[in-house]
């Protein structure tokens, strides 16, 4: 059986970089990437960033006390469009970590061209109660040391 691997990101100069190829399904009637899809690309990069740190999000969902990160706030600035077949780089950098939250700065680039910037705040919550929880120390150490 052929082994299939997921797209790999990489750490470089304190940031995590994840590649995204633009497919026809990502574009709108005007032939450019539909604006909401940039949030999907950013989510994929954040997920792979956490995975690259050795953290499986599924473990938090299967634990007795289910917990995980949810988006609390997002600011996005669209500077230039991406189009079909572009290969983009989505970066993820932790800029602030609090007791129960973290702020990340993300950039989406095509080569050297900056297309989109995103600043996003995530909060660690108990999934059943939807209440904030302190980020576990071992997880906090991993995300601050990235």
Predicted regions and their residues:
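Hydrophobic alpha-helical segments, especially transmembrane helices
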Residues: 45-47, 73, 131
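Short alpha-helical segments used as structural interaction elements across diverse proteins
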Residues: 37, 43, 69, 127, ...
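HotDog/MaoC-like acyl-thioester-processing domains
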Residues: 2-10, 16, 81-84, 95-146
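Hydrophobic residues in beta-strands and at strand termini
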Residues: 20-24, 78, 124
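Residues that recognize and position ribonucleotide moieties
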Residues: 16, 31-32, 67-69, 133
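Residue-level signal for pocket-adjacent positions within structured domains
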Residues: 22, 64-65, 130
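Hydrophobic beta-strand-centered segment that forms part of the acyl-chain substrate-binding groove
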Residues: 49-89, 93-96, 101-102, 115-117, ...
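Catalytic strand-loop segment that frames the active site of acyl-thioester-processing enzymes
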Residues: 2-48, 52
């Amino acid at each position: 059986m052929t082994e299939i691997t997921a797209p790999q990101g990489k750490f470089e100069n304190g940031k995590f970089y994840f590649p995204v190829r633009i497919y026809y399904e990502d574009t709108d009637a005007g032939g450019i990437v539909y604006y909401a899809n940039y949030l999907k690309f950013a989510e994929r990069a954040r997920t792979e960033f956490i995975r690259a740190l050795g953290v499986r999000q599924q473990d938090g969902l299967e634990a007795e006390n289910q917990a995980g990160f949810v988006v609390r706030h997002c600011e996005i600035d669209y500077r230039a469009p991406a189009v079909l077949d572009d290969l983009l780089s989505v970066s993820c950098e932790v800029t602030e970590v609090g007791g129960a939250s973290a702020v990340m700065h993300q950039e989406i680039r095509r080569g050297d061209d900056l297309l989109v910037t995103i600043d996003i705040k995530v909060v660690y919550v108990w999934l059943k109660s939807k209440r904030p929880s302190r980020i576990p120390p071992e997880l906090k150490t991993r995300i601050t040391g990235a």
